[in-house]
Amino acid sequence: MILFLLALIGTLIVMALLTIGRLGFGRSEAFQARKFLRWFIGYFIFNYILGLLILYVSEPALTGPFWGWQWVLWPLFLSSLLNLLGFIRPMMGSLEDISAASQGRRSSSSGRRGIPANTSRGAIAAGIFGLVVAAGVGLLVAGLIVVFTTWFDSNAKALAAIPNISMQKSSDLPQTDPNHIVLVSQDVAAYKGQQILGSNGQNLGSSYNIDPATYTLQSIRQHLYYVAPLQYNNIFINLSNSSTPGFVIVDAENPQAAPELCTDGAHSAHCPTNGASLAYLPGAIFNQDLLRHVYLSGYTYGKLVDPTLELDDNFHPNWSISLMQPTRGYTGDALSEVLLVDAHTGNVVKYTPKSAPTWIDRVMPADTVTQYLQWWGLYHAAPWFNPSGAGQQATASNPQLLYNNIDHPVWLVTMTSASSNDNSSTGVFLFDTHDNKATFYPLAGLGIGDNINQTIASTRANIRNYTVDSTQLYQLYNTPTWVAIFVQKTASGSIYQAVGIVDARNLNGSNVQYETTLSAALQDYQQWLVQQGNNQNGGSTNGSTKTVTGKIERISSVQQGTNTIYYMQIAGQNLIFTANLSLSPKLPLVQPGDNITGTYLSTGSQTVAFQTFDDLTINLSSTPTTPPGGTPTTTPAITPTATSAPKP
């Protein structure tokens, strides 16, 4: 195993330094081969065992300054202390004598203290030399590396330039496909997953659990799901089992869909035919630990970060791991390789970031994206030393996984000014999940932080005071839009109750379109935009504008809040058309049989909203008829005549 070779190399480095200290600086002591050999073998064994332990437990990445071999400073430091024990003991005794004398007490020791006769002065020299090297390299040199790679303006600009950022002139975000909006939060997924854990009659909950933080959003076969692994309840369960039974799948687009528990032998279209059990997990013991398994497989030359459980198109479980290497001293981690680990067999395959399978949703870690954008916000338009904070920006939220395109998600990060009193955005980043590329949209003035949830929760429709569990920023109908999930909190998670949609530029509780289903909320929102005249009367969600002309077959009106909405069926059309009263004053007069014309957006939905509307049957442009060569005639007024009461 590579671990034994690395430990051997580390031990040789430590012993070489200690030997230099003993023989080079302890020359006052006569060289005794047997004594030296006994000392060398003893410390060699000690450092080899200690090196194995450090490598096995901490898995240091062999990259960056000193090629990552600074981990040997710990064995060197401990070995140096052990070599100094013969000197430290009498020194501590002398300090005790001095302390006693200063307090007017007699020392408890008798006689003069000194270094024991059997103490090797060469060992003391080795210990002192080892401590000097450890302190010099671990503190002084490491500190200088940090200073000369991250301090001062040139280094700050270099850090800000690590992400490849393009600036958009338009604030319009890419359009979102409304058919793939996330309606299940991580807490809702955790609640549904907990319910399914004990549903198969195997009492799996007594041995395994699902960490709510491990639910991972991902696209599988053009649909969004949450996936979470079953984990061991305790070390004793781990010791008695070589794998966990499998994983849980929760539909992220449909909160009413039943979750599924995938184990070996499970019969479901959303479960693999075999190999559902997970032999390697983050946090498992010994070689079952995922990162340790990968490290021991030879991937020691980078930082192994962000292990993510992802299912391929056959719903087979795999772990994706990002292998990062620093570009500026100890920092500036850049994605070097993508490792794909079969969660069932442990087979490891490496890819370059651009050649990774397309079904892997993300290989750029969220923490790395945050660090990149923090550097960019601090230094791209401001100097390194900037106590005023002028020109600086900061991330206003953690990266959110956004599926504008179902097959190509991006990290969405809202930016704000560096001022802690600022509650609005300066722009929005969309960061590629497969490459070090980001696009900045100058979408300024959006609400940020807790005020988004609080404002949306204040809508009058939320009469039961449900909690806003999550919000995501989408581009719907050419409008930046917050989509929020209303939930009822429980001890084991959250229960979906409703969805709220609001224009991000007009964040107000009274503007929230609150419905129990997404389709109804989208319909309300589109009508609200039409009424407000926003963004081309409702804009497009990846649809095209079409014109329809035909005869009304059915028409009916409904009241939605303060809006009157007309629903129409037109001959020869397989769609239901809606129109807000604000579109035309003719709408209350429309009857079956009237010929109408209008434009709408074809988005694939069965219900579409008119952007323009006119009833061709109702002609309001006609004028009184004038006889040839004459003047318009008026109709004589009819005056009612009184009648006498009948005689009795």
Predicted features by range, described:
Residues 4-632, 636, 640, 646-648:
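Soluble extracytoplasmic regions of secretory-pathway and membrane proteins
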Residues 1:
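Nucleotide/phosphate-binding sheet-loop regions of phosphoryl- and nucleotidyl-transfer enzymes
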